[in-house]
Amino acid sequence: MEKTFAIIKPDAFAAGNAGKILARIYQEGFTVIGLKKLCMSQREAEGFYAVHNKKPFFAELTKFMSSGPCIVMVLEAEGCIGKWRDLMGATNPADAKPGSLRREFGTIVGENATHGSDAPETAAVELEYFFSGLELL
């Protein structure tokens, strides 16, 4: 069974949508095998998004991701990465298909409610940033 890493971002949490997003995750057939509510420090956000450290949006992204609580998760399902990315929708909520999480709960590109790994290798690195193997059920 494939795994992926997911985040319910601070904007969705602040808007009171974390529970609605979690409900959709379960409704769509994902199994949550790891879940933590946390507030990333600026340093933790910079470490997690280090792959983007030379990009112009890096400072804004890490400031936003350390601006409030979020939920980090490890999801499991058949074809999990593609299935989760499809449920999230396009990065820009305005371009996301109706019914997708980003269309429903996101507002702008930088505050688009959710994050998801884009490949198995990325998922492995990202989930290990927040979870040890002993924490995944």
UniProtKB/Swiss-Prot annotation:
PROSITE patterns: NDPK (PS00469), NDPK_LIKE (PS51374). It is an enzyme of class 2 (transferase). Pfam families: NDK (PF00334). One of its GO terms (biological process) is UTP biosynthetic process. Signal peptide: none annotated. The keyword Transferase applies. Its EC number is 2.7.4.6. It catalyses: a 2'-deoxyribonucleoside 5'-diphosphate + ATP = a 2'-deoxyribonucleoside 5'-triphosphate + ADP; a ribonucleoside 5'-diphosphate + ATP = a ribonucleoside 5'-triphosphate + ADP. GO terms for cellular component: cytoplasm. GO terms for molecular function: ATP binding; metal ion binding; nucleoside diphosphate kinase activity. It is found in: Cytoplasm. The active site is at 115 (pros-phosphohistidine intermediate). Disulfide bonds: none annotated. It comes from the Bacteria. ATP binds at residues 9, 57, 85, 91, 102, 112. The keyword Isomerase does not apply. Its cofactor is Mg(2+). Keywords: ATP-binding, Cytoplasm, Kinase, Magnesium, Metal-binding, Nucleotide metabolism, Nucleotide-binding, Phosphoprotein, Transferase. Major role in the synthesis of nucleoside triphosphates other than ATP. The ATP gamma phosphate is transferred to the NDP beta phosphate via a ping-pong mechanism, using a phosphorylated active-site intermediate. HAMAP family: NDP_kinase (MF_00451). Homotetramer. NCBIfam families: PRK00668.1. Belongs to the NDK family. This is Nucleoside diphosphate kinase. It comes from Desulfotalea psychrophila (strain LSv54 / DSM 12343).
